[in-house]
């Protein structure tokens, strides 16, 4: 099993798909990496030799921000927005949608579960 950037790549998948298991690498970036290293995209992960794994690892370390570094960068960006109190930062702080979606109804994913509010009680009939 190939281990790249702290992620165990699935053995029986094509290397093109297996690389997408690394956070920060999608299908297009995976194809780009394989083109740079001259590795066929149809090779299964278990059939890679050590030299090919090392070449993929070197390209990832030198050219791309992946896994922990990328997650740290994203969280620092959000923290910066919150500190300088931009509109997006305030929406992050309040846990509301950032990009202009309506919040009077919907927005349940961002705001969390439904909170029931007690309504008026009907007066008993006489």
Swiss-Prot record:
- GO biological process per UniProt: translation
Pfam families assigned to the protein according to its UniProt record, in alphabetical order: Ribosomal_S13 (PF00416)
Q: Which domain of life is it from?
A: Eukaryota
Q: Which InterPro entries match?
A: Rbsml_uS13_C, Ribosomal_uS13, Ribosomal_uS13-like_H2TH, Ribosomal_uS13_bac-type, Ribosomal_uS13_CS
Gene Ontology molecular functions:
rRNA binding; structural constituent of ribosome
Residues in a coiled coil are none
Gene3D superfamilies (alphabetical): 1.10.8.50, 30s ribosomal protein s13, domain 2
Localization, UniProt: Plastid, Chloroplast
One cellular component term from this protein's GO annotations in UniProt? cytosol
- Ranges of biased composition (kind: Basic residues): 101-126
Keywords per UniProt: Chloroplast, Plastid, Ribonucleoprotein, Ribosomal protein, RNA-binding, rRNA-binding
Q: List the disulfide bonds.
A: none
Q: Which PANTHER family match?
A: 30S RIBOSOMAL PROTEIN S13/40S RIBOSOMAL PROTEIN S18 (PTHR10871), SMALL RIBOSOMAL SUBUNIT PROTEIN US13M (PTHR10871:SF1)
UniProt lists the family membership as follows: Belongs to the universal ribosomal protein uS13 family.
Outline the subunit composition: Part of the 30S ribosomal subunit.
Q: What is the protein name stated in its UniProt record?
A: Small ribosomal subunit protein uS13c
Report the source organism: Porphyra purpurea (Red seaweed)
